[in-house]
Design a protein with these regions (language model features):
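C-terminal capping alpha-helices of c-type cytochrome domains
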Residues: 369-413
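Short coil/turn segments within WD40 beta-propeller repeats
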Residues: 28-31, 46-50, 68, 87-91, ...
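The canonical Cys-X-X-Cys-His
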Residues: 316, 320-329, 404
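Electrostatic cytochrome c docking/interface patches
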Residues: 295-319
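Hydrophobic beta-strand positions that form the internal "hydrophobic ladder"
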Residues: 40, 81-82, 123, 164-165, ...
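Gly/Gly-Pro-rich "capping" loops immediately C-terminal to redox-active cysteine motifs
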Residues: 331-369, 392
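WD40/WD-repeat beta-propeller blade N-cap
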Residues: 23-30, 64-70, 104-111, 146-153, ...
């Protein structure tokens, strides 16, 4: 088993004081959340999986295995936990220790979600390669099936009766008995995720709606916004959904009747989790915020996890703020997802110290200059640096790219 930059730490530099309820420690957008009675398991764009003591708001363990974004997390019956990533891998971690007991690499694309069966025997994963993976926890045996006609699986969840729900970009919701499809329901728009609300499946859509599904079709619908919804969580009593604009709505699980709306101020909210009394929101600012489920009131301070390291009031500094979440301008990386940009110009790609670059970047022959940095943001990382773990972000306007390059020339010296 080849472990990629596995790190572990106990209550180290990302430990929060006991009086602070928010969880600070990720250096990139928080894209995965799972909760147990006293723990939180998070994953983020910074490739880290963090296990938290929920009561003390303290990091218990920090792990790095995945190449790229950690897309899903789940707790397991034996006290261990699971993580899945953009790299197509599913890792099973023991309750104690810092190395995974099993790593499955059955998917050829990012994994959209994980779901534990009600009997605790099976972990299901759905991937953008259109396949479902069923992992038997006791034996480690894996079964993979083609599920959505080669289209992306965008969410999975188990109903209390043991049937698996999967949704995909082929605009279908499928109910599975084991690995056998038993019901297929057409969807009106592209689904972005699913969570189980009692005996129903709460599905979020790119058209800004949440729809509640039973075995015979739609039970309830709530149109929340004109923007795509990015995250969903549910319990037998409540459904929470979040948009790419950062709004969060809480609804009744029975009929999606509105309860309250939150504005975390975190940029896009990429992940949600519900307990009996709390809502947790994972934001684009790397912060996990906590809210009272009954009132919608914040439980923590809400201070931004990442601030601009340098601001001279220029347009370039304004454009830089989108980069500051994942990169620092100081000699160290500031516990962020990407390498420091200190001393950027004149540096060969993938040579900043103390950063675990992907193999694809280490093979490239690029030197960072004003011209190459501008081209990176003109065409995007997927085109300019294929194999990069960097999100495919672009700066479309030439004047904004020029302003960013001028700012970096000043700020990275």
């Amino acid at each position: 088993m080849r472990l990629l930059g596995l790190l572990a730490g106990l209550c180290i530099s990302i430990t929060a004081p006991a009086e602070a309820s928010d969880l600070r420690g990720h250096g990139g957008p928080v894209s995965a959340l799972a909760v147990s009675e006293d723990l939180v398991l998070s994953g983020a764009f910074d490739t880290r999986v963090i296990l938290w003591d929920r009561e003390r708001a303290m990091a218990l363990r920090v792990l790095r295995l995945h190449e790229g974004n950690v897309t899903a997390t789940a707790f397991l019956p034996d006290g261990g936990y699971a993580s899945a990533g953009q790299d197509g891998r599913v890792a099973l971690w023991p309750a104690e220790g810092i190395e995974p007991r099993q790593v499955s690499h059955e998917h050829e694309a990012p994994i959209a979600g994980l779901a534990l069966s009600p009997d605790g025997a099976t972990l299901a994963a759905g991937g953008w390669d259109g396949r479902l993976q069923f992992l038997t926890l006791e034996t480690g045996a894996v079964r993979v099936i083609d599920a959505h006609r080669g289209e992306k699986v965008t969410g999975v969840g188990y109903l209390p009766d043991g049937r698996l729900v999967s949704v995909g970009s082929d605009l279908r919701l499928i109910l599975w008995q084991g690995a056998r499809p038993v019901t297929s329901i057409g969807l009106p728009a592209s689904p972005n995720g699913v969570a189980i609300a009692g005996d129903a499946a709460a599905v979020i859509f790119a058209d800004g709606a949440v729809r509640l599904y039973g075995g015979n079709g739609v039970l309830a619908e709530s149109v929340l916004t004109e923007r795509p919804l990015a995250a969903v969580a549910a319990s037998p009593d409540a459904v929470a959904a979040a948009s790419v604009e950062g709004e969060v709505w809480v609804m009744a699980a029975r009929d999606l009747a509105p309860r309250h709306a939150l504005e975390p101020g975190q940029g896009p909210v990429w992940s949600l989790a519900l307990t009996k009394t709390e809502i947790l929101t994972g934001g684009g600012d790397g912060l996990i915020r906590r809210w009272d489920l009954a009132s919608g009131e914040p439980l923590g301070t809400g201070a931004e996890a990442v601030e601009a390291a340098f601001d001279d009031g220029s347009r370039g500094a304004e454009v830089w703020r989108a980069c500051a979440l994942c990169h620092s301008l100081t000699p160290d990386d500031g516990n962020r997802a990407g390498p420091t940009l200190h001393g950027l110009f004149g540096r060969r790609i993938a040579t900043a110290e103390n950063y675990d670059y992907s193999a694809a970047l280490r093979r490239m022959d690029i030197v960072w200059t004003p011209e190459t940095v501008s081209e990176l943001f003109e065409v995007g990382p997927d085109t300019f640096t294929p194999g990069s773990r960097m999100p495919d972000q672009r700066v479309p306007a030439a004047e904004d790219r020029a302003a960013l390059v001028e700012f970096l020339a000043r700020a990275t010296r």
